[in-house]
Amino acid sequence: MTLDKLRKKYIDFFKSKKHFEIMGKSLVPENDPTVLFNTAGMQPLIPYLLGEVHPSGDMLVNVQKCLRTGDIDEVGDLSHLTFFEMLGNWSLGAYFKEYSVKCSFEFLTSSDYLNIPKDSLYVSVFEGDQKIPCDTETAKVWESLGIPKDRIYYLSKAHNFWGPVGSKGPCGPDTEIYVDTGKIKCSLDCNITCSCGKYFEIWNNVFMQYNKDENGNYIELDRKCVDTGMGLERTIAFLQGKSSVYDTDAFIPIIKRIEVISGKIYGQKEDDDRCIRIISDHVKAACFILADSSVVSPSNLGQGYVLRRLIRRSIRYAKKLGIKSHFLADLVDSIETIYGSFYNELTEKKDFIKKELSTEEEKFFKTLFQGEQEFIKITRNLPSKTIPGDIAFKLYDTYGFPYEVTEELAFEYGFNIDKVGFDEYFKKHQKTSKKGGDKVFKGGLADYTYETTRLHTATHLLHKALQLVLGDHVRQKGSNITAERLRFDFVHSEKMTDDEIKKVEEIVNLQIKNSLSVKKSIMELSEAQKKGAMALFGEKYDNLVSVYEIDGFSLEVCGGPHVENTNELGTFKIQKEQSSSSGIRRIKAILIDK
């Protein structure tokens, strides 16, 4: 079983069960200010799980690219990944627990698909609590399929309950499916909750059955949904009998290339192996970010900061392997070899990806040189041979100088570092960053408030107004919306004049004043294109799409949501117009209530 074969088997199975295959979304979420990247297969589908009508129907299947940055420092072991793929199938009110469980069981055990022995399957269900009853319904389905009671575990909310995101919203019990790997039990008490590796969690089916209200009550939903997820890389490792995802075809070509560049052989020395795993993971993630969005480039903010960190961490660990020359672009072909047949954007943007990686690589080499000069300058005036923690942290935080490099220089110049002091400053920095991250995340996976909905509609008016003022070459390259403002990136090579900005504002505000209705239609993509509907440049769309028309003024392919009439928007005001990147301009704008 290979990466490509498992993807295809999963999609083909659910298509045979009348599910419609939808395209996975970009890693960079569109119009979702609450997260930097799509972190789960269900994230792009949140509006539809909350009640929006999906243009492709109520039974869906897809493969979603995901990127999680919370565990970047953990990457390097045998299991953690930054970039990964999630296989998922969805029911938006079409079916519920029984059919979901039966489909999962068939895919896992059928000789036409994964052919896993039924006798090796274990499952868990929600045990219930004071507010929500035990999920005996799911347990009975498993029993009917031949899973004995002693292999059905009833576990707490911490194990078998999903959501809500934030303090209220859709949520429900889940059932997790495990496979006995055949390893010896670590103890007499060893079971599916144990982390020894005997039991492999292969699938998770979430049943969105309740809505939690502001008072903490769980109310049964009329329209119940199913969201399932199977991690592609982890499942491939299990099916191939490998102890690590890095020993599979998801990584082998990259690792082989690193071996050639470094002269090190993977599997001979653990310190070298860890470096190789970090490089292969981080460069892969960086390639997918760059392939997905020409708006994101290495920087010190948001998505750009994550991209920069991935690239620079790769360079740092390459240095430990003894790689002294530029090497990042040399790995892109290996990544394309693995993924290019399924993700053609890697092939289409290969030259761009190589250029961006090489540019950032060159910048970091300069940073290392400047950091060394700063190190010499600082240590020259120290009263002792110990570098205080705050100074070591300053080199890290202000100059982007990795601690490990400071440590190497300290050894070279005969200094020690107050590591305890550095760690204290670093932990404070992490807490501050985490608070900021939590603030973003707790807003929900998709912040569909009335304020953001108004601003989303305003971006459609802005897009059309920019075309009328600047020309038809204007195309949206990305947007970001919070409750306070919109940010809109578009193709245009020159700075806008004050007169052009004024004209755009006047056009948008005229459409607001004219009280134009906003209507949604579902049609085939080809039909939308014939009608002249604008679409996000570079985005992949399903055959059936949602199209929003602002009465005779604007027509765009868009997932929504939007207000019903432009008179709900207030007054549109552009606060700032600036360069985003080469050939891309950025506008920040607000709506002022009447």
UniProtKB/Swiss-Prot annotation:
InterPro entries listed in its UniProt record: aa-tRNA-synth_II/BPL/LPL (IPR045864), Ala-tRNA-lgiase_IIc (IPR002318), Ala-tRNA-ligase_IIc_anticod-bd (IPR018162), Ala-tRNA-synth_IIc_core (IPR018165), Ala-tRNA-synth_IIc_N (IPR018164), Ala-tRNA_ligase (IPR050058), Ala_tRNA_ligase_euk/bac (IPR023033), Thr/Ala-tRNA-synth_IIc_edit (IPR018163)
Compartment annotation: Cytoplasm
Source organism, top-level taxon: Bacteria
One GO CC annotation: cytosol
Molecular function terms from GO: alanine-tRNA ligase activity; aminoacyl-tRNA deacylase activity; ATP binding; tRNA binding; zinc ion binding
Location, primary (coarse class): cytoplasm
Cofactor-binding details, from the entry: Binds 1 zinc ion per subunit.
PROSITE patterns named among the record's database cross-references: AA_TRNA_LIGASE_II_ALA
GO biological process: alanyl-tRNA aminoacylation
Enzyme class: ligase
Residue sites binding Zn(2+) per the record: 456, 460, 558, 562
Keyword ATP-binding listed: yes
Keywords in alphabetical order: Aminoacyl-tRNA synthetase, ATP-binding, Cytoplasm, Ligase, Metal-binding, Nucleotide-binding, Protein biosynthesis, RNA-binding, tRNA-binding, Zinc
Catalytic activity: tRNA(Ala) + L-alanine + ATP = L-alanyl-tRNA(Ala) + AMP + diphosphate
EC number: 6.1.1.7
Listed cofactors: Zn(2+)
Function: Catalyzes the attachment of alanine to tRNA(Ala) in a two-step reaction: alanine is first activated by ATP to form Ala-AMP and then transferred to the acceptor end of tRNA(Ala). Also edits incorrectly charged Ser-tRNA(Ala) and Gly-tRNA(Ala) via its editing domain.
PANTHER family: ALANINE--TRNA LIGASE, CYTOPLASMIC, ALANYL-TRNA SYNTHETASE
Annotated family: Belongs to the class-II aminoacyl-tRNA synthetase family.
Record's comment describing the protein's domains: Consists of two domains; the N-terminal catalytic domain (in this organism this is shorter than usual) and the editing domain; the C-terminal C-Ala domain found in most orthologs is missing. The editing domain removes incorrectly charged amino acids.
Protein name, as recorded: Alanine--tRNA ligase
Source organism per UniProt: Borrelia garinii subsp. bavariensis (strain ATCC BAA-2496 / DSM 23469 / PBi) (Borreliella bavariensis)
